[in-house]
């Protein structure tokens, strides 16, 4: 069993190292900032990787459901190998997605330095919005794997409770179960109890329990690392989203200023027209007053001999 665990962990470590090398090589590949076709091609590549991750998640769910009906240690071992393979594959896929998102972010940053494509431009808003959309999908994926990890841990806890009752005839309290799981002593305790009670015929059951324990712990470690990668990507995409929100906020403020300026200009024109109208009226009134004053004087002057 120890050989199996060591072998599985070594494969996982080797793959993790290879992924890191792949990441370094991928980061050396530049994405043409001005080429939208290449940008959207990269986006489609990320979506394909996401689709593959969804399929692996479905396989892990199916394997977890299958584990509930398997009670033979050899069958559990075979199932564990499948799940190990799926988890290492999903880790590699997700790290590839992370590398591509970094490339997209660098491409967007370079694009903002191009004349006419700076922050707030339609091209920049489109690019930022696309990356932000990928981030929302990544968050959903992260939540899916987090729920799967929680579900597996809960179901394993229930398995330990059932086995404890089978061996001792007593229902384990919360503290006992947590101690058995956290310390890894559940299998040792069950083995001791079985031997003391002379239940040699159920040793295969013990092997099955140990396989389940090893599977859950190994998968949980891998899923925790996967969760951390998701968190790293979420931080990257959140920065893009905040930038988009800032751009949209500034555009909204600019639009508000323009509208306010337009309203003020319209008001000024109306005021100007009103001033002209009143000036004309005042002029006419002044002329009328002058005529009214001068007419009698002129009339009397004309009537004098």
Swiss-Prot record:
Cytoplasmic topological domain: 1-278
Keywords carried by this UniProt record: Acetylation, Coiled coil, Membrane, Protein transport, Transmembrane, Transmembrane helix, Transport
Segments crossing the lipid bilayer: 279-299
Coiled coil start-end: 46-66
t-SNARE coiled-coil homology domain location: 206-268
Molecular function in Gene Ontology: SNAP receptor activity
Summary of the function given for this chain in its UniProt record: Vesicle trafficking protein that functions in the secretory pathway. Acts in coordination with SYP132 to mediate tip-focused membrane trafficking for root hair tip growth. Functions in root hair elongation by forming SNARE complexes with VAMP721,VAMP722 or VAMP724.
Name the UniProt record assigns to this protein: Syntaxin-123
């Amino acid at each position: 069993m120890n050989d199996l665990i060591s072998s599985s962990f070594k494969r996982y470590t080797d793959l993790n190292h290879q992924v890191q090398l792949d990441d370094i090589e991928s980061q050396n590949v530049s994405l043409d900032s001005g080429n939208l076709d290449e940008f959207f091609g990269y986006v489609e590549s990320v979506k394909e990787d996401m689709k593959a991750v969804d399929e692996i998640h479905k396989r892990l769910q199916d394997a977890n459901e299958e584990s509930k009906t398997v009670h033979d240690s050899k069958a559990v071992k075979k199932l564990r190998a499948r799940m190990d393979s799926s988890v290492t594959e999903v880790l590699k896929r997700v790290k590839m997605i992370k590398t591509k998102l970094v490339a997209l972010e660098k491409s967007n940053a370079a694009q903002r330095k191009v004349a006419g494509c700076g922050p707030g431009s339609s091209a920049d808003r489109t690019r930022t919005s696309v990356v932000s959309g990928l981030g929302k999908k990544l968050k959903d994926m992260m939540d899916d794997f987090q729920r799967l990890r929680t579900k597996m841990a809960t179901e394993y806890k229930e398995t330990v409770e059932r086995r404890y009752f089978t061996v001792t005839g007593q229902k384990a309290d919360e503290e006992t179960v947590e101690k058995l799981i956290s310390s890894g002593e559940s299998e040792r305790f069950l083995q001791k109890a079985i031997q003391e009670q002379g239940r040699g015929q159920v040793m295969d059951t013990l092997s099955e329990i140990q396989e389940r324990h090893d599977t859950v712990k190994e998968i949980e470690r891998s899923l925790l690392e996967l969760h951390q990668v998701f968190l790293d990507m979420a931080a990257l995409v959140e920065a893009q989203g905040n930038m988009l929100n800032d751009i949209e906020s500034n555009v909204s403020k600019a639009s508000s200023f323009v509208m306010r300026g337009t309203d003020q200009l319209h008001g000024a024109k109306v005021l100007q027209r009103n001033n002209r109208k009143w000036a004309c009226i005042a002029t006419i009134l002044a002329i009328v007053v002058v005529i009214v004053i001068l007419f009698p004087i002129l009339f009397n002057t004309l009537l004098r001999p």
